[in-house]
Amino acid sequence: MNTFGDNFRVTTWGESHGKALGAVIDGCPANLPILEEDIQNELNRRRPGYSIFSTPRKEEDMLEILSGIFEGKTTGTPISGLVFNKGQKSKDYSKIKDTPRPGHADLNYFLKYGNYDYRGGGRSSGRTTIGNVIGGAVAKKLIEFTHNIKIIGYSTKIGKINGDFDYYKNPEFFESDSNIEKLFEKTENNPLRCPSKNSDEMKDYVLDAMDKKDSVGGIIEIIIKGIPQGVGNPVFNKLEGKLGSAFIGINAVKGFEIGRGFESSDLYGSEMNDEYYIDENSINEKTNNAGGIIGGISTGSPVVLRVSIKPTPSISKIQDSVNLISNENEKIEIGGRHDPIIVPRVIPVLESMAAITVADLMISGGYINPCRL
């Protein structure tokens, strides 16, 4: 499937070395103020060349809106946007077209379909997340305009090095919108999008991996602030279930947790439970160990999510593989231009999928008028 969502639907299309990539967004209400540059700004955060740790593939990723936005507002009709590929070098892959790359979807695609686009992974490439970000930019605008919901992501771990900043070290920090704006500026000016004081140590770790012709992964934390109580449904349409599906749909993602996550298995119930109190006739939580979701439904506290990102599978080391034509063992050495770490570029993609998920559930739950704003 290439479509995500039930009421706010995003269909992505395109391949890494194809002519273009893009998205069609269906279900966005009319009259949402949005400019092409709002979407372009999100694409700029994802595109190659973000930092010294990004692939040297040169792509401007300039957006073209084909429909659905007129005179600075959505019309209520499908929004279609695309980005043309201009910097692809398909010849880099011609020598290994019959030799699947370890860690990539090449072999699985070939075994399932009997055919696959070997040029940069085709549809399984991280470049296809351009469509996710186009859809996510619209969703971000929608939930912020209607409910002042803000979504921010940042690295908390790079390789084996843990950072010193995350939600649970200072939850009060996230109560202020101005703090979130400052955090965004800080992370965007860091090549690893990491606000931790020891980010220089992390940079050295990645540089060392590059020298060894290797790659590294990491952990990203995503915070959704301002989501009202009641978003999501019990059992099979849970908020965390939808978010998990959205995140796991990104190829680099290998793990997902909510709130205290796996750490909660170490805690007593008395430590994990979020106790309640009344303040100015409002029921509040003393803590947010559940991460803003209980019973599949948002509590009104910030939603706290963490995602594990695997090391970039394209590395320059010689690896063992097979030849699909001769059916013999074969060594493979991957050329081309690749990220030694994909973590910082995945952050805007995760933010986008979180926004799409929230927008979809808020429309279905009656928080946002599906017709017009």
Curated annotation (Swiss-Prot):
**Keywords on record:** Amino-acid biosynthesis, Aromatic amino acid biosynthesis, FAD, Flavoprotein, FMN, Lyase, NADP
Catalysed reactions, as listed in the record = 5-O-(1-carboxyvinyl)-3-phosphoshikimate = chorismate + phosphate
Annotated pathway: Metabolic intermediate biosynthesis; chorismate biosynthesis; chorismate from D-erythrose 4-phosphate and phosphoenolpyruvate: step 7/7
Name the positions where FMN binds.
R123, S124, S125, N251, A252, G295, K310, P311, T312, P313, S314, R337
Give binding positions for NADP(+): R46
Q: What class of enzyme is it?
A: lyase
Q: Does the keyword Hydrolase apply?
A: no
Q: Which GO terms describe its molecular function?
A: chorismate synthase activity; FMN binding
In the Enzyme Commission scheme, what number(s) does this protein have? 4.2.3.5
| Cofactor info, note text | Reduced FMN (FMNH(2)).
The UniProt transmembrane annotation reads none
Instruction: Check the record and name the Pfam families matching this protein.
Output: Chorismate_synt
Q: Which processes are annotated in GO (biological process)?
A: amino acid biosynthetic process; aromatic amino acid family biosynthetic process; chorismate biosynthetic process
Give the CC-aspect GO terms: cytosol
Q: What are its cofactors?
A: FMNH2
Could you tell me what this protein does? This reaction introduces a second double bond into the aromatic ring system.
**Family membership noted in the UniProt record:** Belongs to the chorismate synthase family.
- Kindly provide the name given to this protein in its UniProt entry: Chorismate synthase
Q: Which organism is the protein's source?
A: Methanococcus maripaludis (strain DSM 14266 / JCM 13030 / NBRC 101832 / S2 / LL)
What is the primary gene name for this protein?
aroC
